[in-house]
């Protein structure tokens, strides 16, 4: 299932929410109707949380089946939730917007080039996958220009063929380029997807929807 939606009147829904196949995190000030759309489309447990004083849950949190990486002021809000045994790492670093700076699945993680090696190792341990530093089309905030699930990975249309092959080999998944929200290359900020469903910003065109659906469904 693929559906258009906005969060808090924004089409950049990926900065507000984060999902995996079993759990979804949304900001506390989302409406009950918006929450219901996420539950029905993504088919997961849905929790409304805040991370510090921020509602930008998608920007502040990254996860896979093994672990969660979150900004340093967000860990207490997660400990009381049913997160299916995941490890939790809080990042006390200027790059603590984990959702913007990390893209991960159950095979690998790609992280911002400027993470120190000590934090790279901690991320690797918590997510339980090979973790490498890099960028996508020159963008260091890799989580903002990529989105993935078990079926595929969509990255900014500015990524070249060598990058697409590298990402496909790294994440062991089919990778395609595309846009959302009427031409935005920030697909990670515009799309929320797991293996059960896909949500996209309301400005996404029918052509973009087809590409997204073809990649992630």
Swiss-Prot record:
Record InterPro entries: eIF6 (IPR002769)
GO molecular function: ribosome binding; translation initiation factor activity
Source species, domain of life: Archaea
UniProt key word Aminoacyl-tRNA synthetase: no
UniProt KW keywords: Initiation factor, Protein biosynthesis
GO biological process: cytosolic ribosome assembly
Gene3D superfamilies: L-arginine/glycine Amidinotransferase, Chain A
UniProt KW Protein biosynthesis keyword: yes
Family: Belongs to the eIF-6 family.
Stated role: Binds to the 50S ribosomal subunit and prevents its association with the 30S ribosomal subunit to form the 70S initiation complex.
PANTHER family attached to this UniProt entry: TRANSLATION INITIATION FACTOR 6
Protein name, entry field: Translation initiation factor 6
Lineage, highest ranks first: Archaea, Methanobacteriati, Thermoplasmatota, Thermoplasmata, Thermoplasmatales
């Amino acid at each position: 299932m693929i559906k258009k939606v906005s969060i808090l009147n924004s089409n950049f829904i990926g900065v507000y929410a984060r999902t995996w196949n079993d759990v979804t995190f949304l900001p506390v000030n989302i409406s009950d109707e918006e929450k219901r759309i996420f539950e029905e489309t993504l088919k997961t447990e849905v929790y409304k949380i805040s991370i510090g004083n921020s509602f930008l849950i998608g920007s502040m949190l990254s996860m896979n089946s093994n672990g969660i990486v979150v900004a340093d002021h967000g860990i207490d809000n997660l400990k009381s939730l049913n997160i299916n045994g995941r490890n939790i790492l809080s990042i006390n670093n200027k790059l603590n917007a984990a959702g913007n700076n990390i893209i991960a699945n159950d095979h690998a993680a790609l992280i911002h080039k400027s993470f120190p090696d000590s934090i790279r190792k901690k991320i690797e341990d918590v997510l339980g996958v090979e973790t490498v530093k890099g960028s996508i089309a020159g963008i260091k905030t890799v989580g903002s220009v990529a989105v993935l699930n078990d079926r595929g990975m969509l990255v900014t249309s500015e990524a070249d063929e060598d990058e697409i092959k590298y990402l496909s080999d790294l994440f062991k998944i089919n990778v395609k380029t595309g846009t959302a929200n009427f031409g935005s290359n920030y697909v990670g900020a515009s799309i929320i997807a797991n293996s059960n469903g896909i949500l996209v910003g309301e400005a996404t065109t029918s052509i973009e929807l087809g590409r997204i659906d073809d990649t992630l469904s």
